[in-house]
Amino acid sequence: MPKMKSHRGACKRFKKTASGKVKRERMYGSHNLEKKNRKRTRRLHQSTLVDSTQEKQIKRMILA
């Protein structure tokens, strides 16, 4: 059986932490920032963890 290939788009978007959880960046934080207040843009630049309901599928895509 051939080797499994990882999903390259998912590998660019998600990283596995040392404890085994999956980290992601928030959306809506890259442009049109003048319409958003400072508190919101600061929060959008922080990374967060993937929800536990989707963690299994993403780990399978990035082969982690």
Swiss-Prot record:
PROSITE patterns listed in its UniProt record: RIBOSOMAL_L35
Annotated SUPFAM superfamilies: L35p-like (SSF143034)
Pfam families reported for this sequence: Ribosomal_L35p
Record field: compositional bias (Basic and acidic residues): 25-35
Region (Disordered): 1-64
Alphabetized UniProt keyword annotations: Ribonucleoprotein, Ribosomal protein
Cellular component per GO, a single term: cytosolic large ribosomal subunit
Gene Ontology process terms (BP): translation
Name of the protein described by the UniProt record: Large ribosomal subunit protein bL35
Organism expressing this protein natively: Prosthecochloris aestuarii (strain DSM 271 / SK 413)
Gene (UniProt): rpmI
